């Protein structure tokens, strides 16, 4: 079963997790018109990541709500990372997970612009 790492102590769950898999939902904070929230991509990625984490008995990391949304620059509410910042962020997370003996890191991407 996927376990979301949030405000409660998950250290024992990490210790007991034998799958060696961590999943991080990655979305974006950007406009989607007046009919959808700014975090639509994060909501979608989180939904699928939770399902996959349960199926794989993986640890579910908190969602990354920001991505590269350069195509939406100028729309109010959009927060975009530079591609090199996103790459550095992912590398840092990968290094941290590797140090904790996580063998597989899955990014469940919910935003087409995250192509850094």
Mark where each language-model region is.
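Glycine-rich, flexible loop/turn motifs
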Residues: 32-34, 60, 77
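Active-site histidine-anchored catalytic micro-motif
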Residues: 2-7, 63-116
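Short catalytic helix/loop segments, enriched in acidic residues and glycine
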Residues: 39-54
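Active-site and ligand/interface coordination hotspots across diverse enzymes
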Residues: 1-37
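A generic structural signal for alpha->beta connector loops
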Residues: 20, 55-58
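Short Gly/Thr/Asp-enriched flexible loops that form oxyanion-binding sites at enzyme active sites
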Residues: 36-37, 41, 112-116
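Glycine/small-residue-rich interface belts in oligomeric ring/scaffold proteins
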Residues: 45-46, 60, 65
